[in-house]
Amino acid sequence: MVHGSWPYYIRNNPINNKDNEAERRNEKRFLVQEGAFVMFRPSDTGVGRLIDISMDGLTLDYVSSKEPEVQPTELDIFVVNSPFRLQGLPCRTINDFVTFTTYDGALSKRRRGVQFGELTKNQELLLTHFIQYHTTGPV
């Protein structure tokens, strides 16, 4: 099959490739309530909206005017109108792709999948708390 054909694109598009993604995940994912955000360090992408989370990673959406150049090594999770803040989680980007581009191409909405590194006991406790109180249920 030619690589440019429609069925090949659907099958190999990261958005549609759920089977491989599910096989790589070790922990159950949970949908996150509105108002939870992620900030990377170092970052050239600003703040992103948290979509789902597990004990070993998360997915977020963010808006950018360019392809990310800096690979973050840590992230913070915070919730608006809440004192909750989980800081300094070690991380690495698993995937990052465009989900929408403006007509003029100046901005794009991107989705990034992140895997956590080794967490401290305190970070694990706070992450468990976040999943318990700031998610709406399993994906």
PLM feature spans:
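Short, charged, solvent-exposed linker or helix-capping segments at domain edges/interfaces
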Residues: T102-Y103, Q123-H129
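Short beta-strand-centered aromatic/proline hotspots
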Residues: V47-L50, G88-D96
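A generic structural micro-feature
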Residues: K28, E67-E69, P83-R85, G105-K109
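N-terminal helix initiation/capping motif
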Residues: M1-K66, T128-V139
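Short, conserved charged micro-motifs
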Residues: E67-Q71, N122-L125
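Short, solvent-exposed secondary-structure boundary/capping segments
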Residues: L58-Y62, F97-Q115
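Short conserved beta-strand and strand-loop elements enriched in small hydrophobics
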Residues: G35-F40, Q71-Q87
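A generic structural motif
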Residues: S54, T93-F97, E118-T120
